[in-house]
C-alpha cells in the first residue's frame, strides 16, 4: 500500500512539473512579445517550455531552432547553424527587469553583439551607462614588453568579441581567437594570443562592474 501511494505521489508530481518550471521561467512573456521571431516559432518554443521536465537540454525543436538553456532569468536558443540568441533578465533598482540580449554568430569567426531593451522591447540608447564594451587595449596584459604589446595590437585588429552569460548575474567577454591562432605562423604570435585574458563582469546596482583588470 505504501509503495502504491509513493508511485501515485511521484506521478502527480511529474504531471505538475512542466507547468511549475514554465511558470518559473520569467523570460516567457518577453519571448512572447519579441519582435524578432515569427509567431509560429514562438509557439513552438513555448510548447517546449511547457514540457521542460520531460526533455533534456539542448533540445532540437525543428530545423535549426534549438533550445540550449533555460533558467528563471535566462533563455538561450540556437537560431541557425551559426547563430545564437540569449536573453537574460537583469534586475533594476526600481524592480523592473532590463532585457539584455546577446546575439552571436559563430562562423566564419565568433562575433557577438550585446544590446539592452526595456520590458516593451524598446532599445536602450544610452547603453554605456549600463555596460562599456572592452577595447583591444583592455586585453593586452600590462606586463608585456612594448614590442609584444605593439604586435598584439596588430593581431587584435579588427577586434571580434564573444559574450557569454555566466551564473550569478555575471557576463564573460573573450576575444575570438581560433582564426587568429590558425593564421599565426610564428610561435611567438601564438604565445601572445594565448596570453589574452577573458574579462568578467558582475551585474550590480543597475550596471556591470568589471571584476578583473
PLM feature spans:
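Bacterial Sec-dependent N-terminal signal peptides
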Residues: 1-27
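Terminal domain-start segments
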Residues: 22-92
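Surface-exposed loop/turn elements that mediate protein-protein interactions on large endomembrane-trafficking
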Residues: 64-76, 118-127, 204-205
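Short consensus segments that form the blades of beta-propeller domains
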Residues: 77-78, 104-110, 152, 187-192
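Short, surface-exposed coil-to-beta transition loops
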Residues: 82-85, 109-114, 156-159, 194-197
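Acidic/hydrophobic-patterned starts of short beta strands in beta-sheet-rich repeat architectures
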Residues: 93-104, 166-174
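Mid-length scaffold segments of soluble, non-membrane domains
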Residues: 97-132
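Short aromatic loop motif centered on NTY/YTY
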Residues: 127-203, 209-213
Amino acid at each position: 500500500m505504501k509503495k502504491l501511494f509513493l508511485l501515485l505521489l511521484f506521478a502527480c508530481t511529474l504531471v505538475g512539473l512542466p507547468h511549475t518550471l514554465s511558470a518559473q521561467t520569467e523570460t516567457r512573456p518577453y519571448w512572447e512579445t519579441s519582435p524578432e521571431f515569427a509567431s509560429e516559432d514562438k509557439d513552438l518554443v513555448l510548447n517546449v517550455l511547457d514540457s521542460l521536465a520531460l526533455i533534456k537540454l539542448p533540445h532540437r525543436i525543428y530545423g535549426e531552432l534549438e533550445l540550449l538553456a533555460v533558467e528563471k532569468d535566462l533563455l538561450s536558443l540556437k537560431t541557425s547553424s551559426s547563430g545564437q540568441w540569449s536573453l537574460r533578465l537583469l534586475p533594476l533598482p526600481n524592480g523592473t527587469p532590463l532585457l539584455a540580449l546577446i546575439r552571436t554568430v559563430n562562423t566564419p569567426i565568433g562575433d557577438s553583439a550585446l544590446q539592452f531593451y526595456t520590458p516593451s522591447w524598446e532599445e536602450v540608447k544610452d547603453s554605456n551607462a549600463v555596460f562599456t564594451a572592452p577595447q583591444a587595449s583592455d586585453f593586452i596584459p600590462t606586463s608585456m614588453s612594448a614590442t609584444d604589446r605593439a604586435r598584439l595590437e596588430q593581431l587584435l585588429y579588427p577586434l571580434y568579441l564573444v559574450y557569454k552569460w555566466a551564473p550569478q548575474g555575471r557576463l564573460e567577454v573573450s576575444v575570438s581567437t581560433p582564426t587568429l591562432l590558425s593564421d599565426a605562423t610564428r610561435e611567438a604570435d601564438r604565445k601572445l594570443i594565448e596570453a589574452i585574458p577573458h574579462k568578467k563582469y558582475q551585474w550590480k546596482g543597475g550596471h556591470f562592474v568589471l571584476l578583473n583588470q
